[in-house]
Amino acid sequence: MKKYLNKTPEEVIKLVTIEIIERAIKLGRKNNRTISISKTSGGKGTNVEKLNPKTEIGKEQLEKFFSSIRRHYTFSGLGSPEEKNSINWRILNLPFTRRLLVVFQVALSFVLKGTPFKNKLYRWMGIHVGRGAEIMQLVWLDHFRPELIFIGENTLMGAFTRLTVHAYEGSGKFRYGLIEIGNNCKIGAGTGMGPIRIEDNVRTLPGATLSPYFSNIKNGSIVGWNPPNVKESKE
């Protein structure tokens, strides 16, 4: 996972998306399917063949596609599981060997308490973990694409917290995005979140659900209650 080190969130999601585009082209040709990528969850997609980084025209179109980096992308056209030429979204995402390795790493980290070794393990997986961060036991950090998760310095992740960077939407369609948690945050036990940006000094109450209700939590906010709401800092 070294190629994701010292990269900004925007650089990482661009790298990840190019990797998936290349796999989509290969699998689409093999299974005779047209796969598209969209910058929105429901918008009209672009045929991945037009974004082939191995051709000159494709490189140009790819740079235009990334002229503005989005925080999430959607792939469609994989087909339903019952179709003979359908493509499993898990196979599109990662090769089998890496999927197996990441699942093993997640299983091991799942039972470890907040220790320096655990942080090193997460970094080895590709997760960006800041200095002084504490990740308690039974925290679920999505193994779909661990490198899309950024946890700031001196941030506490309470037990049973769930971070999910992807969503499978059925009918051969899935999306993924970035999760960014700032510095000095306290994420309460059992908090659940999808792609989101959380600024510094944010506190979530136990059991809070942050996505899809919010896409950005401002500095110093307190998030919780049912239904969820945000109490912003007066500073």
Region locations from a protein language model:
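Left-handed beta-helix
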Residues: 105-180, 190-196, 210-211, 215-216
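Terminal amphipathic alpha-helical/low-complexity segments used for targeting or macromolecular assembly
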Residues: 1-126, 220, 226-235
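Glycine-rich hexapeptide-repeat left-handed beta-helix
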Residues: 2-14, 18-23, 80, 159, ...
